[in-house]
Amino acid sequence: MSNALAKKDIYLDLSIDDDGFDFATSIDDALAQAEAELVVLNETVESIKELKPQCDKLDYILAASSGALCGVIDIFLVGKPGESPIGDITDKWFANRTMDFAKLCHPDKKEFDSLDSALRFLEKEFKVPYDQTGLGDAGRAVFGMNAKNHHFKSLAHNPSLLGLFFSILDQFSNTSHFISDGQLISLQQADDKWELQGGNIPSKLFCGFVNWFGHLMSDVSGSNSSAKAGNRGMGIPSPLWTWTNDIIAIKAKLGLSVTDTDKAMNELALEIFEKGYDTRFQTAQAIPVFLNELLVRLIYAVRRLYRYFTETPKVERSFKLMWKKCEPFSNPTVKRMLTVAHGTFCLVDAGDAVGRALVSGGGTFNVVEFVLRLNVVGVGRFAISLYGETKRAISYGHAKSCLLYTSPSPRD
C-alpha cells in the first residue's frame, strides 16, 4: 500500500457458535461511525480556526497606530471639562436636541429660537417634587446641597434604572431622596402643590416615566438661568459615575453599613461633576473611542478586500465569499486588532492623565485631575476587549484539547 495513504485498522466483533460464525459489527456500521468522527473532527478544526486570530505584523502596526492617533485626539481635543473643543461641540448638540424636544412637546410645535426659552418651557411642563436646589426651599435641610450639585445628589436626577425607580417613588409619595455625606436622606412632603397625573396605577406609572425623562431633558443642558447668562450650566450626571450614589442608596435600604471607600468614591464623583464632568462631557469622551473602533474595522476590511481581489480568480468571486473574507465584525482577527488599538489608546490617554495629575499637584498625585482627564469610555471598551480575548483563549484551549482527544492515534 502506498505510504501516502494513512490507514486505520477496523476491528469487527466476531462471535462463533456451533452453527458457524457472525460479525457483531458490520462494515457499514464501522464506516458510519468513522464518518461521524470525521464530521466532529472537522467541526473542531473549524472551531479552532474561528477562535485563532490571523493577524500579521502590519495588522498590529496599523491597529497600534490607530490607537495612538485617537489617543492624541483625546488628549488635545477632549482633554477635561471646560477645556474641550469636542466638548463644546457636544454641548451645542445637546442644546439643539433640547430645543427639538421642547418643540416636539409644545402643543403648537413652537420653534424655540434660544436654549433658555426651551428650558423654561420644559421646566414648567415637566414639574417634579424632587427638584430642590438648596436655595431657600426644602433642600436647605440637606447639608452642602446647592444649585451646583443638586443634580448629582438627587437620586431621581440620575440617568439610571435606580434613578428612574426613585423618580417614580418620589412622584407617588411626594418625597425627595438625596445622597449627602454617605447617607440616604428622604424629605417628606417635598412639594405642597404636587399632584401626579393619572386616574389609575398604570396611567400614573406612565406619567411618572414621562415626567422623569422630560425633566432630565430640561436639565441635560443646564438651567434656563445659566443658559440666559451664556454659561454652560450644570447638566445631569454621567451614567458611568452614578453608581457611586447607587451603592450608598442600596446599602442604606438594605441596612448595610457604608464604607469609607464608598464615601470617598462618591465624594470624588461629586467633585468631578461640580467641575463639569456630566453626560455631555462623557459623550465627548466617547467620540475618539468610537473613531478608534471605526478606523480599525475599516483598516481590516480594506486590507482584506484588496487581498480578496488580488488572490481570488474572477470566476470564483462572489459577494458571499467577499463578505466572508472581509467582514470586520465577528472574526477573531479584527477583535485582536481592536484589543491592540484600544489598549494603545488607553496607554496614551492614561500616560497623559498621570503626567498632568503630577504637574497640577506640584509633584503629588492629583486624583481629581487624573479622573477628569482619564477617558473612562476608552477604559471600559478596552475591558470589554480583554474579556473577549480571555473568553476566546479559554474556548481555544478547550477546542484544542477536544481535537487531541478525537484525533485518531496510529496503531502498530
Regions found by a protein language model. Name each.
Residues 1-407, 411:
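Glycine-rich, hydrophobic membrane-spanning regions of integral membrane proteins that mediate transport
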